[in-house]
């Protein structure tokens, strides 16, 4: 079965300090190309026979692994964005400032890093070490060791084999150059302002219970519904009160939009 392009797990227009244009380009071009290339590689693998040179099979399997990592990490990255509009005094996250780690997560990671501030310093420092290069920074939960680690994943493939990524930051230049140029530090700061901490906590819970990481289904975002033109017309015709806060054209043939 071919790998499908997942609906983008964040509404790009709701992010703070990250342009919709950059997120859409990242989703369509980088994530989308990874999915399409993965499917092409798997078609080649399905066609191998006894006459296939071993080096070719080895190369295809290495490429498949890298692409699988790229697809999964991109989906996790988009899935842990979108928190800026979610929090507030009644969010239950206990966060007084967007740049601070919520109390619920601070309690989770304090044992392994000493404090939330110490974790953040290491995570941010690791991300800054990749500026001008490429790779991912991951907060992972080791199911075997029952603890958290910050890790670098280069070429989409390098991470502890027992680790579940619970927070993912893309440090490839395509993730930030359009908006931030070479200023990776500003991008990292803005990333923290947009983390969906609720998604992170759900991933931690799943990892602790040896459950699959949850899919960030954008349809669960009920506070900002999307309607087609036909659905909107029907609601108006039925006399329903409708407030339009955002309207934009999409090309259905290019991608799946919410």
Could you say what each language-model-derived stretch is?
Residues 1-218:
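Feature for soluble, non-membrane regions of globular proteins
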Residues 208-258:
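Flexible, polar/low-complexity N-terminal or interdomain linker segments that lie immediately upstream
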């Amino acid at each position: 079965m071919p790998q499908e392009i997942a609906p983008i797990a964040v509404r790009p227009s709701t992010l703070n300090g990250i342009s919709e244009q950059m997120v859409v380009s990242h989703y369509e071009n980088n994530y989308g190309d990874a999915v399409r290339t993965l499917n092409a590689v798997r078609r080649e693998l399905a066609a191998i026979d006894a006459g296939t040179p071993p080096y070719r099979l080895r190369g295809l399997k290495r490429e498949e692994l890298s692409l699988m990592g790229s697809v999964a990490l991109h989906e996790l990255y988009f899935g842990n964005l979108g928190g800026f509009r979610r929090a507030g005094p009644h969010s239950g996250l206990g966060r007084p400032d967007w740049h601070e780690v919520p109390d619920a997560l601070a309690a989770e990671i304090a044992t392994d890093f000493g404090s939330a501030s110490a974790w953040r310093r290491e995570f941010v420092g690791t991300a800054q070490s990749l500026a001008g290069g490429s790779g991912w920074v991951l907060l992972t939960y080791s199911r075997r060791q029952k603890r958290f680690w910050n890790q670098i994943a280069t070429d989409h493939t390098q991470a502890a084999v027992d680790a579940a990524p619970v927070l993912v930051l893309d440090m490839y230049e395509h993730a930030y150059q359009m908006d931030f140029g070479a200023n990776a530090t500003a991008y990292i700061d803005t990333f923290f302002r947009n983390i969906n901490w609720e998604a992170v906590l759900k991933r931690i819970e799943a990892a602790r219970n040896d459950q699959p990481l949850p899919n960030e289904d954008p349809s669960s975002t009920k506070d900002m519904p999307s309607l087609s033109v036909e659905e909107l017309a029907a609601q108006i015709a039925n006399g329903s009160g409708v407030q339009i806060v955002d309207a934009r054209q999409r090309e259905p043939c290019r991608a799946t939009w919410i």
